[in-house]
């Protein structure tokens, strides 16, 4: 999923 502030999985 898209975790804004970290990485995009």
From Swiss-Prot:
Record protein name field: Neosulfakinin-1
Main location group: secreted
InterPro entries registered for this protein in UniProt: Gastrin/cholecystokinin_CS, Sulfakinin
Source organism superkingdom: Eukaryota
Function: Myotropic peptide.
A single Gene Ontology CC term: extracellular region
Modified residues (Sulfotyrosine): 4
Residues found modified as Phenylalanine amide: 9
Location in the cell: Secreted
Pfam families in the record: Sulfakinin
UniProt similarity note: Belongs to the gastrin/cholecystokinin family.
Keywords, in A-Z order: Amidation, Neuropeptide, Secreted, Sulfation
Organism: Sarcophaga bullata (Grey flesh fly)
GO process terms (BP): neuropeptide signaling pathway
């Amino acid at each position: 999923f898209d975790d804004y502030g970290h990485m995009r999985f």
